């Protein structure tokens, strides 16, 4: 008896991992084939419909296209075929006359029902296309698993031998050192206490043990990578042989050479919503473990429309699985779901190796690339002259081009309280937040953080040198997520000031960048110090926004190198008005070098943090500057600043600041007034000098914990002369 079950749509065998059914008519479908016969809409067991007019029609439909006529659509049948009965049925019911027009309507409905019952032209649907036979792939996986068993068994044996040899050598070393100490102690020649000797020997032992573990980890990772590379080639050979049977398959049978992609990532998709169904499958699969890579890939790719979808499913599954925090039982069996990830347990298999392995099971060409990265601990201006900042990532052939994937960085994405519309969710060993930037990253963006040892894998028309890689600005993924760019195309990671200690960094905002808010931090490059002579270094940076450019102008207070860290976040006007703290994430960093300083720099007045000028007031509060559109105001003893409101704001408060002057002494210098939709801020300065003006406002209905609180609106830098 043949126990194999086949998909009613595509006719191929279905397996438990992607099976839907049996349905009411005893049919089965692949998950990818379980779609409406007419429109291709994905169906569920609660939403699919059958053709009730034809029991021989085993197809499934959505509610909009199911070929079934309701009871009211059917013509009323004659009881004996006589004209009398027909007449009675059509015109007289219980002695009441029925409009003859109803008979015409019934005829029309009957014709419609007949048309509905006719088979629709079948849509073109590829279904769940598995190039390689399930049993064939499973057999190869079992052979690969046997090779892994042997490899990990050799790892364990060598670990035991190394541990025994280490303890033996360590014991001999301790015994020798203690014996020599005893001889010297008896002769009175020892200049060290026994406790100090034991402490010294312990430190030496820990260092040797750490070196042993590091070398062992590197060796085992290298051997595992070699094994996975060989197994991936064997799996791809299986796909190559199977693809030769399908003349219409466009995916190359052998990996093409590395060349720049034919199009950008944004030309393939612009929003992650494109992968919503794919991501849901990955989340579901991560919750429900499978016992083989063959089953895992068939489940992940069940609804895939293209090779991009398949790679996306693998990427999301890996980033959902919080591999770095998994806890493995020592008694874990190799043929269990968790046994699939034993390489993670042993520390021999990393994200990039696992990604390559899974890609081979899906028939995708994938390579592991080694090189440098501007990873944790890196600062702008650093040189890659040793083994620090070594990293590994992947390139996978998708949509006709090689595309970069960095699963490790995609999974380690940290989420701040106000970062986007949703917070990270975790469920045991699962995490649902990730960084989409590191999936199919454009080569022009990837080069800012990763430099391959083989220049060809930069995938750039004009590859960069290592020196150029060191010099280009140090940016993070959010820089590209927010679609930012630098005004100066020749800007480098190290910025040099002029003789007055001034240097500027300007960033162009995207067309719809009104919701972006920036922040910065300034500290000394060689330490965590952020003050000089008791003053915050932040007061030596002026941040301003004009039109679509945000500028950070640094005035170095000394020749000591500085580190400028620029942060950003996308915040709605409503969220900002609540006054709740906003969490920022770094978008770029710069080293600021002042080789000579001929002018003594004066710190800015101590105002609220953030940008100077009225641009924020316009973006977030709808205030239009009528009198002073720039951040800096040059005036005499008096000045009046005017705004026009585009939405109702109920109160304005102005606060004046000056270096070496108590703010309380300046309270009487400002007055605020509202007249219609106009806002007036009037200031009388007590003397010449540089002032900072903070302006606060609130909405009528703005309550925070039952209180009406003011929110910072904007600030000006004012130079008063001729007082």
UniProtKB/Swiss-Prot annotation:
Molecular function (GO) terms for this protein are: metal ion binding
One of its Pfam families is Ig-like_KY
Q: What keywords are assigned to this protein?
A: Cytoplasm, Cytoskeleton, LIM domain, Metal-binding, Zinc
Keyword 4Fe-4S recorded? no
Kindly list the GO CC terms recorded for this protein. Answer: cell-cell junction; cytoplasm; cytoskeleton; striated muscle dense body
Superkingdom is Eukaryota
Cited InterPro entries: Ig-like_KY, Papain-like_cys_pep_sf, Transglut-like_Superfamily_Mod, Transglutaminase-like, Znf_LIM
What's a BP term from Gene Ontology annotated to this protein? muscle structure development
Specify the LIM zinc-binding domain's residue ranges.
5-72
Q: Where in the cell is it found?
A: Cytoplasm, Cytoskeleton
| Name of the molecule in the record | Lim and transglutaminase domain protein ltd-1
- Name the species this protein comes from: Caenorhabditis elegans
Its lineage opens with:
Eukaryota, Metazoa, Ecdysozoa, Nematoda, Chromadorea
Q: Which gene encodes it?
A: ltd-1
């Amino acid at each position: 008896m043949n126990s194999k079950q086949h998909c009613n749509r595509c006719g191929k065998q279905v397996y438990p991992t992607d099976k839907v059914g049996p349905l009411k008519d005893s049919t089965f479908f692949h998950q990818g084939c379980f779609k409406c016969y007419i429109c291709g809409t994905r169906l569920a067991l609660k939403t699919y419909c059958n053709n009730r007019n034809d029991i021989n029609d085993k197809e499934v439909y959505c509610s909009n296209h199911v070929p079934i006529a309701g009871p009211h659509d059917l013509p009323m049948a004659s009881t004996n075929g006589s004209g009398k009965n027909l007449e009675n049925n059509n015109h007289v019911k219980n002695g009441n006359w029925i409009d003859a027009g109803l008979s015409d309507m019934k005829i029309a409905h009957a014709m419609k029902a007949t048309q509905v019952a006719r088979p629709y032209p079948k849509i073109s649907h590829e279904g769940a296309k598995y190039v390689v036979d399930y049993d064939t792939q499973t057999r190869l996986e079992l052979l690969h698993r046997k090779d892994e068993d042997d490899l990990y068994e050799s790892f364990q044996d060598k670990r035991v031998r190394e541990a025994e040899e280490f303890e033996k050598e360590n014991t001999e070393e301790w015994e020798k050192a203690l014996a020599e100490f005893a001889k010297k102690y008896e002769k009175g020649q020892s200049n060290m206490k026994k406790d100090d000797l034991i402490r010294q020997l312990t430190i030496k032992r820990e260092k040797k043990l750490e070196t042993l573990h590091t070398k062992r980890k590197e060796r085992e990772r290298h051997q595992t990578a070699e094994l996975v590379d060989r197994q991936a080639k064997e799996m791809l050979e299986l796909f190559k042989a199977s693809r030769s049977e399908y003349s219409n398959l466009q995916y190359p049978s052998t990996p093409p050479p590395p060349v720049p992609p034919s199009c950008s990532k944004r030309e393939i998709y612009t929003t992650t919503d494109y992968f919503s169904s794919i991501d849901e499958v990955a989340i579901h699969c991560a919750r429900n473990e499978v016992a083989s890579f063959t089953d895992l890939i068939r489940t992940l790719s069940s609804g895939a429309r293209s090779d991009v979808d398949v790679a996306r499913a693998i990427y999301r599954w890996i980033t959902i699985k919080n591999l770095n925090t998994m806890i493995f039982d020592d008694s874990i069996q190799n043929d269990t779901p968790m046994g699939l990830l034993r390489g993670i347990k042993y520390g021999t298999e990393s994200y990039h190796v696992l990604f390559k392995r899974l890609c081979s099971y899906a028939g995708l060409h994938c390579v592991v690339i080694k090189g440098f990265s501007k990873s944790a601990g890196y600062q702008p201006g650093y040189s890659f002259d040793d083994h620090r900042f070594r990293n590994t990532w992947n390139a996978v052939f998708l949509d006709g081009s090689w595309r970069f994937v960095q699963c490790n960085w995609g999974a380690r994405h940290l989420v701040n309280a106000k970062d986007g519309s949703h917070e990270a969710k975790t469920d045991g060993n699962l995490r649902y937040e990730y960084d989409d930037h590191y999936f199919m990253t454009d080569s022009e963006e990837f080069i800012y953080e990763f430099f391959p040892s083989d220049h060809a894998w930069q995938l750039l028309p004009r590859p960069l040198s290592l020196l150029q890689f060191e010099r280009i600005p140090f940016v993070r993924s959010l820089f590209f997520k927010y679609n930012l760019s630098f005004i100066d195309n020749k800007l480098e990671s190290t910025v040099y000031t002029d003789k007055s200690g001034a240097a500027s960094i300007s960033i162009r905002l995207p067309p719809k960048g009104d919701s972006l808010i920036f922040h910065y931090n300034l500290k000394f490059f060689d330490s965590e110090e952020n003050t000089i002579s008791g003053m915050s270094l932040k007061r030596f940076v002026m941040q301003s926004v004009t039109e679509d450019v945000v500028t950070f102008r640094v005035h170095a207070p000394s020749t000591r190198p500085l580190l400028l860290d620029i942060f950003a976040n996308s915040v709605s006007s409503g969220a900002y008005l609540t006054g709740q703290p906003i969490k920022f994430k770094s978008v770029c960093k710069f080293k600021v070098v002042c080789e000579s300083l001929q002018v003594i720099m004066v710190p800015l007045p101590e105002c609220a943090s953030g940008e100077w000028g009225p641009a924020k007031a316009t973006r977030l509060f709808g205030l239009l500057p009528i009198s002073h559109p720039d951040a800096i105001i040059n005036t005499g003893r008096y000045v009046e600043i005017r705004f026009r409101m585009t939405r109702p704001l109920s109160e304005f408060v102005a606060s004046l600041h000056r270096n070496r002057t108590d703010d309380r002494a300046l309270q009487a210098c400002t007055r605020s007034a509202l007249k219609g939709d106009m806002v007036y801020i009037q200031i009388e300065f007590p003397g010449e000098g540089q002032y900072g003006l903070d302006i606060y406002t609130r909405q009528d209905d703005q309550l925070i914990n039952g209180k009406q609180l003011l929110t910072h609106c904007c600030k000006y830098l004012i130079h008063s002369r001729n007082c």
